[in-house]
A protein has these predicted regions:
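Short acidic-hydrophobic catalytic motif
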Residues: 2-54, 63-140
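Local cysteine-cluster metal-coordination motifs and their immediate loop/turn environment
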Residues: 60
Length: 140
């Protein structure tokens, strides 16, 4: 969020980086680094200045104890990204075992975050991966 330009954005990524065995075939658009760069660049194009940007981090929960700690890896990635880019982190609510519901008003930088009760979080796996819309054109 840039409070002077009143420009903000929010990202949600499921994996910080592709697993090693598929790195050469993975779409960059599915992973944290690409998505974070895209967000920062879009904010800059809307008048934000990197020197004024401030970040809040939410998420990184490890929802399934049977899987690798993906949420922890995402939290580590997000912290490192901000540090590398010189964007100060003003708040974080990361990790744990509960999902979060985030509401963000980008023009004013207001955030409301709530933990989602474990019994209301989705437990079923999605049926399939949607096709990436990157590089497609919709005519209307």
């Amino acid at each position: 969020f840039d409070p002077v330009a009143r420009v903000g954005g929010m990202n949600h990524f499921l994996l910080a980086e592709p697993p090693r065995h598929v790195r050469n075939q993975a779409f960059d658009s599915d992973y944290g680094l690409f998505l974070m760069e895209l967000l920062v660049n879009e904010m800059l194009s809307l008048g934000a200045h990197k020197s004024r940007m401030r970040a809040r981090l939410y998420g990184g929960a490890n929802l399934n104890p049977d899987l690798k700690p993906i949420g922890t890896a995402n939290a580590v990635f997000a912290r490192q990204f901000l540090e590398r880019e010189g964007i100060p982190k003003v708040f974080e609510d990361l990790e744990g075992v509960q999902a979060r519901r985030i509401q963000f008003r980008p023009a004013g930088g207001q955030v409301r975050a709530r933990l989602v009760p474990a019994d209301s979080a989705p437990t079923q796996k999605p049926l399939g991966r949607p096709q990436s819309a990157l590089g497609t054109v919709e005519l209307f």
